[in-house]
Amino acid sequence: MKNSILKQIFVIGAGTIINVLIGIITVPIITRIVSPEIYGQFTIFDTYASVAVLVLCLGFDQALVRFYYVEDSSNYKSTLFYNCVKYPIILSTVLLIVLSILTFLNIIDIDFDNSITFLLFVYIFLQLLLRFSTLVIRLEQNSKLFSFVNVSQRVNYLVILFFIFRFLNVDKLLALVLSISLACLISLIFGLIFQKNIWNHLEIEKDNF
């Protein structure tokens, strides 16, 4: 048991270290390709998304952690996950649709043009789903998959970014935003594939709640 815990800590720690090393190596390269102004806008984009996800979770991510081990059955965990994720999804969908309409009607201004603003809303939604997906992976103590998803997101972001820079003639801020959004989507797909027993909620046993 002790060796298993240490192994999981080591795997997660190794994934974190790899992510940090990738960041240390690639950030200076990216900042040489794009101007500080554009990279600053991208940082604001990412910050907006991170704050929005924290708010839109409504604390249900903590509720998932709190009640996940109450029962060990897959049906209970799937039902719990469904009940924790559905309200943030509903709220975020409604809110992002409303904000999209208000933005495109120029009623509110979110500091970006329409294409970047649209991608911001898409990215927020993807990040929200990914947050719950990776949380379940961690709660299932699947340290290898957890590290794989985190590292692959960073690697996919860089691969997609350099592909866009090399072969597509698009705005550099748009390239950064597209890359991070697609990388998030790919990581989410990995989570859906490997945790499909949790996501495939066919019947809800309301008696459990």
Feature locations, PLM:
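Signature of the first transmembrane helix
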Residues: 4-61, 123, 158
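Transmembrane-helix boundary and interhelical linker motifs in polytopic inner-membrane proteins
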Residues: 2-4, 34-38, 52-86, 138-144
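Alpha-helical transmembrane segments of multi-pass membrane transport and lipid-handling proteins
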Residues: 17, 56, 62, 82-109, ...
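Membrane-interface helix-loop junctions in multi-pass transport and translocation proteins
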Residues: 31-41, 111-112, 140-145, 155-187
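Interhelical loop/hinge segments that connect adjacent transmembrane helices in multipass membrane
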Residues: 1-5, 144, 169-177, 189-209
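Alpha-helical transmembrane segments of multi-pass membrane proteins
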Residues: 51, 55, 89-93, 109-133, ...
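Alpha-helical transmembrane segments of multi-pass membrane transporters
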Residues: 20-28, 94-99, 150-171, 186-191
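Membrane-interface junctions at transmembrane-helix termini in multi-pass inner-membrane proteins
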Residues: 6, 126-149
